[in-house]
Amino acid sequence: ADCGWLFHSCESNADCCENWACATTGRFRYLCKYQI
């Protein structure tokens, strides 16, 4: 199954790859970023 790649738009962590998080980058944009 595909998962949200880096900087892929998302609504929640479920939209991102495992160990990635849906993080805000601005007022309304949420993008997948790697969780260390």
Swiss-Prot record:
The presence of a 'disulfide through disulfide knot' structurally defines this protein as a knottin. This is Omega-sparatoxin-Hv1b. Expressed by the venom gland. InterPro entries: Huwentoxin-1. One of its GO terms (cellular component) is extracellular region. It is found in: Secreted. Coiled coil: none annotated. It comes from Heteropoda venatoria (Brown huntsman spider). Keywords: Calcium channel impairing toxin, Disulfide bond, Ion channel impairing toxin, Knottin, Neurotoxin, Secreted, Toxin, Voltage-gated calcium channel impairing toxin. Blocks calcium channels (Cav).
